[in-house]
């Protein structure tokens, strides 16, 4: 299979910068032989920062840039001169990116807004220069603080697409056809199952310049939540959707049963998915006359809005848009904060292996060569840092 440009999982090694050493310099001038300490503070190590960017919609740009390392802070110097702060490392990610610790599976953070910045790893604070430690009884301290050490972590970045409506259905249910009919998206469409191999997004225009975003994911089959088919990998892309549009073709042997199978797969994957608003669309309904529609109506699932549609003939499309817009704007449909559960590490590693993302990313770095002038052991307490 050709390598896809849609990358929603990537493993990267991150390392912040260590703080620069404080200086132990003693002031020495022609007419000031005993000038005392004037060593400056070390610079702060650079942070590793995630920044949301709506111009990205996959993690492809990170697949070949697996090491994110911030700069180290420089050492302080004479005349109480501060060392230069290390350069921050900013990682641009698409909105909807979730971060997990690759070793423990624990949730770390997520980025959902354009321009949102999250400090993933903090750089070490710079060490205090010796002038901070001058006292009445200690006029010439010949020690300074070392900078705080760097932090490092290997993380998994997982993309969960941000959309208002998520399309849910079996393969070949007409999801991609609907998306292409009501938006400018051009997903691959063919008369065989599993045509859609990766998620697609489309912006659906409504009235008065209003619009909403629709996401199409590969078809779900029974057992998808256990890893069958393509469903498991892509089910997470509808976790953030406000509303789920279930699509079942009119020629189904049992529409209610198919709906319950789909619902059960979502429940098994994440029980919270059942809290989302749902709409049912019976697709390919241009093959039905009104009499057949009337016969099918009583057999449909109860308690959710439904509509007969045909993406080819346009039957019911405007009604579907009205229903979706109404449901999206209900007060009960506002998404609450998503609870990100820890990942099963063994399952996570297997997914990474399947996608070729399981390579070791430990990075051997060289010493920054700050010199040995200030390389003195100093046991300091936390209060040494305060109010400095």
From Swiss-Prot:
Enzyme class comes to hydrolase
Q: Which UniProt keywords apply?
A: Cytoplasm, GTP-binding, Hydrolase, Magnesium, Metal-binding, Nucleotide-binding
| Entry's transmembrane regions | none
Domain (OBG-type G) ranges:
163-329
Pfam families on file? GTP1_OBG, MMR_HSR1
What EC number(s) has UniProt assigned to this enzyme?
A: 3.6.5.-
Any idea what job this protein has?
An essential GTPase which binds GTP, GDP and possibly (p)ppGpp with moderate affinity, with high nucleotide exchange rates and a fairly low GTP hydrolysis rate. Plays a role in control of the cell cycle, stress response, ribosome biogenesis and in those bacteria that undergo differentiation, in morphogenesis control.
Entry protein name: GTPase Obg
């Amino acid at each position: 299979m050709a390598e896809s440009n849609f990358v929603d999982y990537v493993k990267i090694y991150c390392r912040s910068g260590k703080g620069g050493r404080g200086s132990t310099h003693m002031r020495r001038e022609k007419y000031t032989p005993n000038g005392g300490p004037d060593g400056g503070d070390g610079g702060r190590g650079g942070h590793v920062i995630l920044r949301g960017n709506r111009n990205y919609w996959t993690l492809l740009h990170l697949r070949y840039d697996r090491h994110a390392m911030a700069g180290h802070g420089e050492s302080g110097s004479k005349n109480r001169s501060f060392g230069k702060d290390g350069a921050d490392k900013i990682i641009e990610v698409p909105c909807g990116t979730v971060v997990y610790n690759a070793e423990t599976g624990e949730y770390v953070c997520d980025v959902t807004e354009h321009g949102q910045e999250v400090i993933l790893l903090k750089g070490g604070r710079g060490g205090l220069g010796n002038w901070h430690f001058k006292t009445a009884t200690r006029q010439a301290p010949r020690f300074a603080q070392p900078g705080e050490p760097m932090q490092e972590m290997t993380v998994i970045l997982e993309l969960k697409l941000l959309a208002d409506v998520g399309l849910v259905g079996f393969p070949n249910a007409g999801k991609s056809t609907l998306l292409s009919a009501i938006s400018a998206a051009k997903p691959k469409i063919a008369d065989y199952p599993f045509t859609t191999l990766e998620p697609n997004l489309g912006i659906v225009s409504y009235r008065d310049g209003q619009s909403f975003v629709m996401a199409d994911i590969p078809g779900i089959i029974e057992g998808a939540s256990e890893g069958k088919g393509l469903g498991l990998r892509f089910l997470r892309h509808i976790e953030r959707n406000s509303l789920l549009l279930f699509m079942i073709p009119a020629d189904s042997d049992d529409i209610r049963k198919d709906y319950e199978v789909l619902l059960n797969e979502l429940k098994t994957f994440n029980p919270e998915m059942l809290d989302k608003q749902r709409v049912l669309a019976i697709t390919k309904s241009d093959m039905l006359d009104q009499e057949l529609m009337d016969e099918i109506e009583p057999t449909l699932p109860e308690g959710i809005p439904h509509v007969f549609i045909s993406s080819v003939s346009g039957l019911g499309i405007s009604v579907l848009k009205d229903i979706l817009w109404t449901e999206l704007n209900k007060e009960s449909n506002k998404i609450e904060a998503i609870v990100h559960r820890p990942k099963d590490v063994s399952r996570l590693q297997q997914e990474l292996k399947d996608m070729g993302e399981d390579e070791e990313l430990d990075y051997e770095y060289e010493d920054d060569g700050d010199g040995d002038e200030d390389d003195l052991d100093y046991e300091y307490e936390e209060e040494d840092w305060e109010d400095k």
